[in-house]
Amino acid sequence: MIKLNQRQQSILKIILEKGRLQSSEVHEELTKRGEDISLVSIKRALSSMAKDGALTSIGLGRNTSYEISTIGRVFTDIAEKGYTGIEPDSRFGLDNYNFNLFPEFPTEIFNENEISDLSIATKEYHQKSRNLSSVLGDKELQRFVIELSWKSSKIEGNTYTLLDTERLIKDEIEAPGHAKDEARMILNHKDAFLFVRENEQEYQAFNLRNLEELHGILIKGLGVNKGIRKGLVGITGSKYKPLDNVFQIREAIESLGEAISRAKTPYDKALLALVGISYIQPLEDGNKRTGRLMANALLLSHGYAPLSYRSVNEDDFKGSILVFYETNSVISFKQIFKEQYIFAAEHYAVK
């Protein structure tokens, strides 16, 4: 992946916010924001960033202007709290689906240091899991399933507590005072994870068939239509409007699948599947939970630790996904993914 210093990040944010700019306009914006830098240095930085693929240059000589590329969007460091704290209609993000996003998506999302941290966690996970007895293995699996089903459902607004979820999965006892759909959602998570664990080889690659298969398990009994949605869908708290054409949605899924197949590591594949499914919103309901389970399916199929999201803050999760919807920046969510992967590798031993 490309390396960007603090000044280059500042330039990316300005062009992401303002659109196509010439070097003098970038210099003016940086000066307004308190940066002391010469126009010559700005021109040098812009030229270097265009060469590295973070920017696209248009025109020649004095007429040269710059706009942000897909790679630049993906790696612009957008602060989740600062961005989502702005009213939706005042934010500078995209309103509509970016057709260039997946065809041009980088093959490497994580830098060398991040890959090193993730690899160390994976090695620890393998060591813990290797010599686990069948009895302990079953207990570990059940603990993971309970915590994943609880937290993934909670992110969706489910009000079951962790103890409620444990009783439901272990003893088949529903919590009093809760809607039946809440219990169904949790049990569907359990069934979906166990299904992908038993059919890992089917999930080494992402495609429409296994997307619809996984979604069908997650929405069983919830009154949600299976398959690609045929109507409009809106995103609460966001001005981003997903595709509303069935044929374009299918093409977007195919494009996402190709991007996932190009991704360098299982970490890259899993993260891209999660944000990609959430971004396309191909399903009538349950897109984000399908994305979370698809990410786990890809990790499991490559022998990596699945994520429970137990320690994630739900608002941070939702906010970071929203940043990706509107700006296509993966930086905020990548940090969540990395933290949750390391947490999972350290706390579970799912064989």
What are the residue ranges of the model-derived segments?
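FIC/Doc superfamily catalytic core
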Residues: 1-351
